[in-house]
Amino acid sequence: MRLILLGAPGAGKGTQAAFICQKYGIPQISTGDMLRAAVKAGTPLGQQAKAVMESGGLVSDDLIINLVKERIAQPDCAGGFLFDGFPRTIPQADAMKAAGVKLDYVLEIDVPFSDIIERMSGRRSHPASGRTYHVKFNPPKVEGKDDITGEDLIQRKDDEEETVRKRLEVYSQQTRPLVDYYSAWAKADPASAPKYRAIQGVGSVEEIKQRALAALSS
């Protein structure tokens, strides 16, 4: 099973990716995780990426493609993989097509932007442990404090409403066109194109999971 998971930032791709990867025994390839690891390590590419991400922009194609090409060459990708957050742009999709990367499905998780803003701007985290909360959906026992240590929770810059809105704007301009790209390719050349499927990403985690797994068996 080789697939791309599409959807706006905050659409719940990471949660559903974990279920899909478990079901099919494939690795999740998240450019976000790869970038955060580079930022944490303080590599030159990581430092570049940090400045771009904190301004709400997207990292360059060259940097992302170098990370991804290296990743899918690893042995654990032999039986398939799930791309979460890649490709982000038409040029990236073209580059992947040109490289002959075989894909079975493109699955879109569709969530209204108003829901995404509420989801993301309400996130809070405890930096030392990585524990996460949500002011509405998963609040801490004491407002603004970690349940275990009582230490202050923070709002990541990535989750501030202004940054979220900027990221959604960038998504609309650069990544949303991939929906048309893959659906048009599937209609024009069904023999070689991945199957394109879209599901609603609003509802319980379990409901969305069942929609996703049903879409990937159709």
Swiss-Prot record:
One of the record's GO molecular function terms: ATP binding
Subcellular compartments: Cytoplasm
Binding site for AMP: T31, R36, G57, L58, V59, G85, F86, P87, R88, Q92, R156, R167
This protein's record includes keyword Ligase: no
Signal sequence range: none
GO biological process terms held by the UniProt record: AMP salvage
Domain of life: Bacteria
Region (NMP): 30-59
Record's keyword annotation contains Transcription: no
Pathway: Purine metabolism; AMP biosynthesis via salvage pathway; AMP from ADP: step 1/1
Keywords noted in UniProt: ATP-binding, Cytoplasm, Kinase, Nucleotide biosynthesis, Nucleotide-binding, Transferase
Binding site for ATP: G10, A11, G12, K13, G14, T15, R123, T132, Y133, G203
One Pfam family, short name: ADK_lid
GO cellular-component term (any): cytoplasm
Record EC number: 2.7.4.3
UniProt record similarity statement: Belongs to the adenylate kinase family.
Function: Catalyzes the reversible transfer of the terminal phosphate group between ATP and AMP. Plays an important role in cellular energy homeostasis and in adenine nucleotide metabolism.
Subunit organization: Monomer.
HAMAP family in alphabetical order: Adenylate_kinase_Adk
NCBIfam families registered for this protein in UniProt: adk (TIGR01351), PRK00279.1-1 (NF001379), PRK00279.1-2 (NF001380), PRK00279.1-3 (NF001381), PRK14527.1 (NF011100)
Protein name, as recorded: Adenylate kinase
Annotated organism of origin: Variovorax paradoxus (strain S110)
Gene symbol of the encoding locus: adk
